């Protein structure tokens, strides 16, 4: 009998909310944290990782579309309450982890794809879009 496929679906923040799990040694967030996350998926026999790297803005490095980090600076208090279920310091720390990678010239999506391929996990991107009634018709 063929084994079941295991698909893990994660959004843009999946690897950024729990740094003590993915980078227990601390320090600026690094590509190693992304690899540690994918290692855990592989250990649990996940064979496909679908990640959504966007909301209304791209949460990945882009020169073509606006990104969540375009005007972000470390500790930017404008982001303190953006995710209301978390305390302000958690929101700021999560954004700073993205900035750590950006400053180290790490494209987290590309690095995650590399980690997936190294662990024989199929990397997929899932894209969120507004419902059709919210889109302009362009007519």
Where does each model-flagged region fall?
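Catalytic domains of carbohydrate-active enzymes, especially glycoside hydrolases
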Residues: 32-59, 77-78
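Aromatic- and acidic-residue-enriched carbohydrate-binding clefts of CAZyme catalytic domains
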Residues: 57-106, 137-139
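Boundary/entry segment of secreted carbohydrate-active catalytic domains
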Residues: 1-27
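Surface-exposed amphipathic alpha-helices with a cationic face
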Residues: 1-2, 110-124, 128
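Active-site beta-loop-alpha junctions enriched in small/polar residues
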Residues: 11-13, 54-56, 128-132
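Substrate-binding/active-site clefts of carbohydrate-active enzymes
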Residues: 125-139
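Structural recognition of the beta-strand scaffold that forms the well-ordered cores
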Residues: 6-9, 47-52, 123-126
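Well-ordered, non-membrane alpha-helical segments in soluble/globular domains
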Residues: 25-37, 103-109
């Amino acid at each position: 009998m063929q084994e079941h496929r295991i698909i893990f679906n994660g959004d843009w923040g999946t690897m950024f909310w729990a740094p003590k799990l993915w980078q227990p040694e601390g320090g600026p967030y690094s590509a190693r944290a992304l690899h540690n996350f994918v290692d855990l998926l592989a250990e649990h026999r996940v064979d496909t990782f679908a990640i959504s790297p966007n909301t209304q803005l791209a949460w990945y490095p882009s020169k073509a579309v606006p990104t969540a980090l375009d005007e972000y600076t470390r500790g930017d208090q404008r982001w303190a309450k953006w995710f209301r279920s978390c305390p302000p310091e958690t929101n700021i720390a999560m954004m700073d982890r993205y900035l750590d990678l950006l400053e180290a010239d790490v494209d987290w999506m590309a690095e995650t794809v590399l980690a997936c391929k190294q662990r024989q996990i199929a990397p997929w991107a899932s894209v969120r879009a507004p419902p059709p009634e919210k889109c302009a018709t362009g007519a």
